[in-house]
Amino acid sequence: NGDISAWDVSNVTRMGEMFSGATSFNQDLSNWDVSNVTDMRGMFLGATAFNGDISAWDVSRVTDMSYIFFNAESFNQDIGGWDVSNVVDSSSFDSGALNWQDDYKPNFQ
């Protein structure tokens, strides 16, 4: 795995399934500017080793977070501060994320 922490993703709008099935992926994405992303569907689906701090991400434009952490077994970061007010699909958002504490999850209205 090459270092992708400095990638410029500021113009990306769709990150759906970006790391889907990447079972050994656990890189630092904390500095990524995802403020233009609208689709994060299945982004970390099956990324069983991922537990990166993405709490500072601006996800306020995201509308689809379905399956984003589906079977992301190691994920246990506090993203409770995420603005998910524009999310219209959060189905199976965290199914199978076995180690994730409920109070770390965003509050979908």
Give the location of each predicted region.
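Negatively charged
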Residues: N1-Q109
